[in-house]
Amino acid sequence: MQIDRIKYTMKHRKAFRAVEKQLLGHNTIRGYLHDLDKVFLYMIMDYKRAHKIHRNHSRHHTLKARTHADYVQMVIDWECARLTKPDKQMNARETLDKLYPELKDKVLPVIEELGL
């Protein structure tokens, strides 16, 4: 079991909910469930495998995002990453510009809608 990764993920989940509430005015069911799968995956498998499964199946990641709600969750995730992840200090707009410019047509309107 990867206790440090579980603690890290729990801290990120808390930050996600705080940013979600700040931006949307409320928390969503998806916000409460955000990255919860990782907590359980870290209990039964190594980091690389858990990370791969999570990214391939979670709709708030670029491989699976399809709906407006998916992109809202993605932007919130990008925006809150800098609060708990020392290695990810960009905000949502910077993340879009530097890492995912191919998503600009879908994600930039969401960033602007959220006032970021």
Task: Report each predicted region and the residues it spans.
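Metal-dependent phosphohydrolase cores
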Residues: 1-116
